[in-house]
Amino acid sequence: MAAVQKETGAGLIELLLGEHGCILALLRSMEQRLPAMGLAELKGCGAALEVVLQAHAVEEDQLLFASLDHAPPALEKALEAMYGEHEEMRRLLDKLHTARESGRARSLLRRLVELVREHFAVEERLLFGLVRERTSEDRLRELGRRYARRRGVETG
């Protein structure tokens, strides 16, 4: 009789949570330096944050949210809010790119940091739990493997 092999590897939610931790550390570092930053540095931080947030949002949108076919109304509402926040982050970043004074850029970056924190908190407190209720561990591991391949990392 063939032995049943248990699937290994991190699930998508665990990988996204790890990314949350890294992004939050980056935000804390930016926040500490925020008062002393000039316009060029503020825009540079915005550009770096844009790359990280865009990559993160793509994985959430294409792997996590897209895997939730026929979601119940409560989950649909949460997903719409998440998509809306992704759009708001993009708008803030666009405004930051065109800011001409450091005070305005600082205010935009500060608001972006707050929005990212709020967004992650809702995902962690509500959305990820709803996803776990509706998605098997095997499916989450498969999505985790797809995420890892797309990012060029090994999950085990």
Each model region followed by its residue ranges:
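Small-residue-biased structural context
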Residues: M1-G156
